[in-house]
Swiss-Prot record:
Gene3D superfamilies the UniProt entry points to: Leucine Dehydrogenase, chain A, domain 1 (3.40.50.10860), NAD(P)-binding Rossmann-like Domain (3.40.50.720)
Residues annotated for NADP(+) binding in this entry: G167, R168, S169, S192
Its job: Catalyzes the oxidation of 5,10-methylenetetrahydrofolate to 5,10-methenyltetrahydrofolate and then the hydrolysis of 5,10-methenyltetrahydrofolate to 10-formyltetrahydrofolate.
Protein name stated in the entry: Bifunctional protein FolD
Residues spanning the signal sequence: none
Top-level taxonomic group: Bacteria
Gene Ontology cellular component list: cytosol
Disulfide bonds: none
SUPFAM superfamilies: Aminoacid dehydrogenase-like, N-terminal domain, NAD(P)-binding Rossmann-fold domains
HAMAP family according to UniProt: THF_DHG_CYH (MF_01576)
Quaternary assembly: Homodimer.
Amino acid sequence: MKSSILLDGKAISEKIRNRIQETLAKAKAEGKGIPTLATILVGNNPASETYVNMKVKACEKVGMHSRYIRLKEETTTEELLGEIRKLNLDPSINGILLQHPVPHQIDERKAFDEIALEKDVDGVTTISFGKLSMNSEAYYPCTPYGMVLLLQEYGIDVTGKHAVVVGRSPILGKPMAIMLTNLNATVTLCHSKTEDLPSLVKQADIIVGAVGKPEFIKAEWMKEGVVILDAGYNVGNVGDIEVSKAKDKSSYYTPVPGGVGPMTISVLLLQTMYSFLGQFSPKLESHVANR
């Protein structure tokens, strides 16, 4: 069997960011201005602060403005909705990101759904999810879309392949299952109540780890030649899949870190650029007709 190929999220991410930088420099030279991404952080979660700072720096690097709105831990749902409404009405703001998770007293779903569709560059609103499920143009959840772009950059055709997605969160597992379906894969969506998970994983041509548990998906469950996409990032720099043991039997695999993670922020920047240019992310299409 040929050696497995590492899906280099860092390299592909850099390629995407260079393209964004070139497009925005051209737009600025033509007098079209500069896009702005607004990020809201509620509370004092250290991990969230780190993620937000990474996004702010990434914006600056590609020539994008960022607006960082910091709200106190005790913020109510209504106060947060008020901040989002202000950003919805601000013509200088092209994208709005509400950093997840929010403190327990806030209705996160209500807050997500307050974001204007044309500024939902993180793909978190119910309407964006519905548009994705209908394979209409939309902004997509950034992590699953990043995985799809990785597959496409490496020329991996999922048509007719059996993809097993482990994890059903509304911003990761579920949208990934829909995206793969839209690209003509046959998808099994698994979760914590799934019976005999190892036998399902054994059938997978493509395995997606999106369960949030360190190395939960074992190497021994997988068949030779599988494509491994690990969206997890846990303590100890490990994902949701036993990649260190499974990579030798894979055809392609994402490392942790350096695989899916860099793609997430790049997709956020990409979709903010699309919003600035007045368009949605392109509809997911395969070379095989939908039927």
